[in-house]
Each structure stands twice: as C-alpha cells, then as structure tokens.
Amino acid sequence: MKLRDEKAPWVERDTLVEASPEEVWEALTDEDRLEEWLAPDVELDPVEGGEIAVRDGDEERAGTVETVEEGERFAFTWSRPGEGESFVEFTIEALPGGSRVTVVETPTQSAATNTAGSTAMAAGGWDTRLIRLGRAMRFTPVA
C-alpha cells in the first residue's frame, strides 16, 4: 500500500539530542513522554495498526500507527476533521553522545486539500515540536 503522495509538498526537519536512541524511542512512543513535547493530551497504542489521538486546545488529530521498528523508525498517519491526511515518519540515528531525530511529514494520496500554505504551517509546527523534544530529552522525568 502506497501511503505517501510523492508529488505532494513535504516537510523534513531534524534535530540532535543528547540522548540514546532508546531514550528517544521512549519519547516517541510513550504517551506520557509525548505529552511533554508533542501535545498536552496524547493517546497512543504504539503497535502497527494501533491508534493515535493528539489534542492541543481546540486542535485534534487522529490516525493510525503504520510502522514500528523499535529504536529506529516510527510512523503514523494523522488528520484533523475535515482536512487531508498526512504520513508522519520519525527516524532515529545513533551519534556519538546522542541521536539525530528526523521527522518527515507528507500528505497522503487522499489529501488533495493540502496546499503549500498548509505545508509551511506544518514545517513551523515541527520546528517548535523538535525544540520541545530536545528540552524534554534533557529533563528526563524520574519515576
């Protein structure tokens, strides 16, 4: 099944964090950790076919987990009610002293309503989220 529309505008952002790939993986796949940087209210079943729901104020997105490769790659589709769906993929690369986290968001083939403007908004959103992820990785909560 082809999820991404290769001709559609896309967003790619990355950041370096002072954390192991295992720590980053937890931040990407644990509801409590996601709430530290992605959105205040996250529900996630981190298995292929599982559901994801993200709420931040009046904004809500829901989707399906598509790829789970522990410690390396995590991907899902999500959409807001009445808007096109997009495919979000995180990859983790181990580096000396930390990890590189890359996120790519691409409209799916069913997302004919996506425009260059919505792509620019997505890019700004990921810039902010990755800054928050970096901060969350420095302040790992103690159980």
Residue ranges of model-derived segments:
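Short, highly charged C-terminal tails/helix-capping segments
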Residues: 134-143
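Glycine-rich portal/gate segments that line the openings of hydrophobic small-molecule binding cavities
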Residues: 35-81, 87
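Intrinsic-disorder/low-complexity, polar/charged segments enriched in Ser/Thr/Lys/Arg/Asp/Glu/Gln
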Residues: 10-14, 21, 51, 60, ...
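Beta-strand/loop substructures that line and gate deep hydrophobic ligand-binding cavities in soluble
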Residues: 10, 81-128
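Alpha-helical scaffold segments that form or flank carboxylate-/histidine-based iron centers
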Residues: 19, 53-57, 118-121
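Hydrophobic ligand-binding cavity/cleft-lining segments
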Residues: 1-43
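A short, structured loop/turn motif at beta-sheet edges
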Residues: 21-22, 66-71, 91-100
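Non-transmembrane alpha-helical segments in soluble domains
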Residues: 25, 127-130, 134
